[in-house]
Amino acid sequence: VNMMKAGDGNYYEMRNNAISDMLEPGSTFKTASIMVALEDGKITPHTEVDTGNGIMMMHGRPMKDHNWHRGGYGKIDVTRILEVSSNIGVSYLIDKHYSDNPQKFVDGLKRIGIDRPLHLQIAGEGKPNIRGPKERYFAKTTLPWMSIGYETQVPPLNILTFYNAIANNGTMVRPKFVKAAVKDGEVVRDFPTEVINPKICSDNTLTQIREILRKVVAEGLAKPAGSKQFAVAGKTGTAQISQGAAGYKAGRVNYLVSFCGYFPAEAPKYSC
């Protein structure tokens, strides 16, 4: 239920936030960035990055890890980078391997299909906005910040569709709200499963990503999303909400906090 307060003081269901909100996804987007780099052969799960004391200057702008005030994470590998959701780790790798050709990274995201319209059965769908280097305001800092889920807008359901594809052996399917239309006990119309992208990445990359996401919940920051009854895989997300033209520094600081994943991790049945 998405209830919003109207001018008359009453609350109404005006919009569906899950399909229409165009917010920066934050750290749930890091999985897509790492998937692109793995698929392109730029990194492995064991590739290391020295994140130092938690603050790294990138093109004149400080990139910070959430624990920078405690001294940072030092040298960690790709698996650990996602486990602790290191901004420096992800952004450094993407900037290192794609700064000379940002379009290749953008093409990798589009190859996954995370930007594709879902053509949902309900109205109000937002359109993902993933900018390319030829577009206006694509600066040197855009690539590293895009890699950690900023400077790009993707509706929550599109992010869930991506994680569902990881759970679904790499096949991205269109979210479905109606399975069939029934009249007088008889099915008058079926709504079959529709494939958006038959393969978001290679089997090898998919296996690596699934193992990393399992460890994110088992050993990383997503432990609270775990369960004693079954294994959960997924990724946490925290994004500072932009205050429009004022950017991220004006007034009160608000954050979008999320988790996206699936369970049981070894044989997924549900995405969340």
Predicted segment positions?
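Beta-lactam-recognizing serine transpeptidase/beta-lactamase-like catalytic domain environment
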Residues: 1-26, 32-271
